[in-house]
């Protein structure tokens, strides 16, 4: 999953017929790659109405809704969900092997045979484990997204879709001289518009990401 687009191959393996229950906004039936210059665009577009039928090719979703649903699927399969808890460090056995985590809860230590660090690109757990020897900003990008409200009928008309059909557009260029690109996803009554920017050039340009999004929206 990337941002608000779900690619279902792994879900197909883990949760049969997940698409019958998941909180989906739209099923992606059109995917485009758009190359932008300062004043023009070249669009490579592919559309298949078959993608709007099971087992589907991709979907858009609101992450809070989808992530909550996915967590409940894990609970139903036997996982224990612990919310409102901050992981503060790692536990190690006498040989120095990682065998659990510490938390901000009283008596909140948890032991495990496997610990998976899911605390983001700046993972403090991975650093504590010694997996981040150094951090090079040139290996990182920054993603920023706006969500724009529009009536469903307007989205359907502008993107040439109907019912719960959706569109996924990936953009190369159009980021004000900063290495990177952008994206547009359609939800039922909103559009997600965002950019992904290389950190060194973004810092050198001394521009804020929201300024680059504003310039992208003004592209002719």
Predicted regions and their residues:
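Residues that recognize and position ribonucleotide moieties
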Residues: 4, 26, 59, 80, ...
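Short, mixed charged/polar active-site loops
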Residues: 39-43, 107-109
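Predominantly flavin-linked oxidoreductase catalytic cores and closely associated redox partners
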Residues: 64, 69, 73-220
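Helix-loop-beta segment of a Rossmann-like dinucleotide-binding subdomain
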Residues: 41-63, 196-199
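N-terminal FAD cofactor-binding segment of flavoenzymes
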Residues: 1-39
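Generic secondary-structure boundary/loop-capping signal
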Residues: 2-3, 8, 30-31, 41, ...
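Short, glycine/acidic-enriched capping/hinge loops at junctions between secondary-structure elements
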Residues: 1-2, 44-46, 127-128, 205-206
């Amino acid at each position: 999953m990337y941002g608000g687009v779900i690619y279902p191959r792994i879900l197909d393996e883990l949760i049969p017929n997940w698409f019958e229950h998941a909180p989906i906004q739209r099923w992606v039936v059109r995917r485009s790659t758009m190359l932008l210059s300062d004043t023009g665009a070249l669009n490579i577009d592919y559309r298949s109405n078959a993608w709007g039928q099971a087992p589907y090719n991709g979907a858009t979703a609101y992450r809070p809704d989808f992530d909550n649903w996915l967590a409940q699927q894990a609970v139903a399969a036997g996982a224990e969900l612990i919310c409102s808890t901050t992981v503060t460090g790692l536990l190690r056995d006498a040989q120095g092997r990682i065998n659990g985590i510490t938390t901000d809860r009283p008596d909140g230590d948890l032991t495990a045979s496997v610990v998976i660090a899911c605390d983001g690109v700046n993972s403090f757990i991975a650093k504590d484990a010694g997996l981040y020897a150094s951090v090079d900003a040139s290996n990182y990008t920054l993603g920023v997204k706006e969500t724009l409200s529009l009536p469903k009928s307007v989205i359907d008309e502008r993107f040439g879709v109907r019912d719960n059909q959706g569109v996924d557009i990936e953009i190369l260029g159009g980021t004000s001289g900063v290495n990177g690109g952008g994206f547009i996803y359609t939800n039922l009554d909103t559009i997600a518009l965002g950019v992904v920017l290389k950190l060194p050039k973004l810092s050198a340009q001394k521009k804020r990401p929201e300024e680059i999004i504003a310039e992208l929206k003004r592209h002719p």
